Amino acid sequence: MEEANAKQTAHDEFKRTLREYWGYPDFRGIQRDIIESIAQGRDTLGLMPTGGGKSITFQVPALVMPGVCVVITPLIALMKDQVDHLRQKGIQAAAIYSGMSRREIITTLENCVFGGVKLLYVSPERLFSDIFKTKFKHMDVSFVTVDEAHCISQWGYDFRPSYLAIAEIRKLKPDAAILALTATATPKVIDDIQERLDFRQKNVYRMSFERSNLAYIVRDTMDKHTELIHILNAVAGSAIVYVRSRKHASDIASYISSANISATYYHAGLEPAVKNQRQNSWQQNEVRVMVATNAFGMGIDKPDVRLVVHIDCPDSIEAYFQEAGRAGRDGKKAYAVLLWNNSDRKKLNKRVAENFPEKDYVKEVYEDLAYYYQIGVASGAGYSFVFEIDKFCRTFKHFPVQTHSALQILERAGYIHYEMDPEARARVMFKLGRNDLYRLDEGSAFEEAVITALLRNYGGLFSNYVYIDESLLAQEAELTTHQVYVILKNLAQRNIINFIPQRKMPFITYLRDRVDGDRVVLSKEIYEDRKAQYVARINAMQAYASNNDVCRSRQLLIYFGEERHKDCQQCDVCLEHTSPEPSNEQATTARNAILNLLKDGERHHISELHKLNLPKKGLDIALEYLIHEEEIHLDGSFLFL
């Protein structure tokens, strides 16, 4: 009886915290089960699809339970966003990641040791450092959260060797429970996660991956651009269009805008202020379509996305499912559309060679790095260097794509950490106390305006390094961004603040001392096995796109080990099976309409067929028949007699 009462009291406290800080009346799905499991000190694995509310499952118990919750995540931009949002709610949160100064790291860790922080976000490569391990021993740790837990599994689609250090730091706090969270995991990965994190007992909570409100569509089309506009005109509401390259993002956004549909684009290469502005415009529905690389979407809270379109085919079903799942989080009808044709098959197969260059090439890149940075044998461990891939490739006559892949392989093998898109925003911490600040000799009016803007917009400035937006300060102080930068530098020189300017450059950190290139070990697990897994994932993605016999939703669920007995009745496969075959009369009408369009002897773009206002199934059959019988001809996207 006492145990039941204690359990109810704990649940009431969790629910009260949820209402107080997040405004939700109750937990949803398996959130409550996961929270109660971790509160009882049990190692727990939570499988929650995109939009399932993962962050609630560790943020709520972190506030209720004594001590600090350490959150391990590879997504630096996401951890910064979450820390900012938590601080805005009055919650003490901090982050440690590659690119921070030693002084910043020590200050942050000491705040955790002395009880000033409830949630500490850490990037996995920081777990290797002696500073972290020393301070971690002295922390009162409530539990450890491992976000994106599939990254610890060699069978996962995004394996990161730095995650293997989690099991090592667990030995420093053997009584602290582990909460592992992922949105995408096959049965094999589920078992591997629990084994590699040394779960004391298997304990899995899973939400069904079924999205009954989301219609999965594959469109086989040679003219993706026209089909995209056709889809955007057919489905109203907010949309995301995913592409693979930064240039493609800007090109497609321009193309959509030219069709009088408001669009912008987003990728990791944009300045933080530009990213924030574009993201806010899209979230507030000032812009309808966001064209983006896979850098966009993590942690984005926008439930009313009605459409997600992939113009370029992702490398894996895991990646596709996660990105497609950003549509329809409000539970209302939404669509996930993959535009596909035979050229995508060739592109996917080409990516194998790009992602897995020959071993000798990987070793050559490792040697060239050492020459580039003048790192001698048996030295270099812990050193970080700014890395300009274009300059490096010009120096040693390498190709950027293969070089990028070689560096990732070296990272998986544990030789380096390669941070490709750091988001090193400017940071400030006051060196003076609040009372000392008010007793300062009078500075310039500009300095006072900047200090006032800092105090008005940011909390925690006297105890933590806080991320700042110099453009926001400029707006508040009625100055230019450059003037704000100069003033912050002056305040730092006067020992009023610690100021770390914005820096956005990829960098490489040596995780161990340099060895000779011929002694670099690329094990079967790191290279051959990973390559085979990559090929298997690409094959699975191709099979999904080209399988027109099995319900799309059922295909996805089977891939993730979830059996489904009913078809969704809303994907393109299900609708094709239920739509009636065109009659002979309809087929003849469609053939005549196509021939009539082409009778002028000109080359006509295939998109003009949409203007015939004929049923798609009948039109497709008629087109296939006419091309097969050579009554008409297809050259790229153009039809002619």
Each language-model region and where it sits:
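Amphipathic alpha-helical interaction elements
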Residues: 23, 233, 611-614, 624
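Beta-strand-connecting loop/turn residues
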Residues: 212, 504, 637-638
